[in-house]
Amino acid sequence: MHLLAGLDRPTNGRVKIGGEDITEMPDKQLTKLRRRHIGFVFQQFNLLPMLTAEENILLPLSIAGRKPDKAAVAALIARVGLGDRLGHKPSQLSGGQQQRVAIARALASQPTVLFADEPTGNLDSTSGTEVLQLLREAVELDRQTTVMVTHDPRAAAAADRVLFLADGEIVNDLASPSEEQILVAMKEATHR
């Protein structure tokens, strides 16, 4: 994921985001590209504790010097179900609510690609299901490209395509697999 997001540089091959080759892009230009084209959702939420939910959601736009589209942000907040929690700080929110803030923050800038690193890893099954539904809605309603890294077969089954990695290599590629197909492929990948 770090290679795809331009956080690390590949030793060979090319990486393109939004049609732009980022493989040898200078750091300043790469930072600007990430601000414009990439959203991140992490397992640990990475919300700033001194900011409210609303301030956390709008932070990437502020950093990028972009004015928020108030209607789009309001629709996003309604979609993630946080309208009544915008004035709350992260410590006043449940884990599921914090992850919904993180998803709204990542989507607020309308990125070309959303990277989700174990987005359900710290959540109970109900909150995890809600997060997967939000990511799925972003794909279906906004045509949002999403790359999710997970060890959870249930989470992976929400994807249109699942790649299996073992020892740094892609060892399997399944289109819209079931949870059972993923479990079989995971077992095969670990016993190669």
Residue ranges and their predicted role:
Residues 169-192:
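Conserved beta-strand-loop-alpha-helix hinge in the C-terminal portion
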